[in-house]
Regions:
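Bacterial N-terminal signal peptides
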Residues: 8-16
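Extracytoplasmic copper-binding redox domains, predominantly the cupredoxin/blue-copper superfamily
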Residues: 20-138
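Bacterial N-terminal signal peptides that target proteins for export
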Residues: 1-7
Length: 138
């Protein structure tokens, strides 16, 4: 009986540690306009997991070069598929939808204390992503 209880307690702890901290929708139209991540700004703690949901077609979620903490692994989801990412390192992570990046479809994940905020702000952006990225990092 003790063994069963120990296994049950372990299962509960593991499922709690893998719980989602946030869910971000990839949308053609949202509260902030066309081609958006909603929400566009998420604040979490190291080790938390975010699910990027392909609510509408023709979207993906991938990291933006130059907008990752040092030593963090880049990620790139496939088109029209949900992406689940665990953010282990503290800092600012820029996220883009590759097909709609120039239209400003960007999001920001702030994990713990953002030591790389200045570097993230200085990262080159293109098209409408430039003001959108600036807005999310202020």
């Amino acid at each position: 009986m003790r063994k069963v209880m120990s296994l049950a307690a372990f299962a509960v702890l593991m499922s709690a540690s893998m719980a989602l901290a946030a869910e971000v929708k990839m949308l053609n139209k949202g509260a902030e306009g066309l081609m958006v991540f909603q929400p566009a700004l998420v604040k979490i703690e190291p080790g938390d997991t975010v699910k990027f949901v392909a609510s509408d077609k023709s979207h993906n979620a991938e990291s933006i070069k130059g907008m990752l903490p040092e030593g963090a692994a880049p990620f790139a989801g496939k088109m029209n598929e949900d992406v689940v990412v665990t953010f282990d390192k503290a800092g600012v992570y820029g996220v883009k939808c590759m097909p709609h990046y120039a239209m400003g479809m960007v999001a920001l994940i702030v994990v713990g204390k953002p030591d790389n905020l200045d570097a993230a702000k200085a990262a080159p952006q293109s098209g409408k992503a430039k003001p959108a990225a600036r807005q999310t990092t202020t």
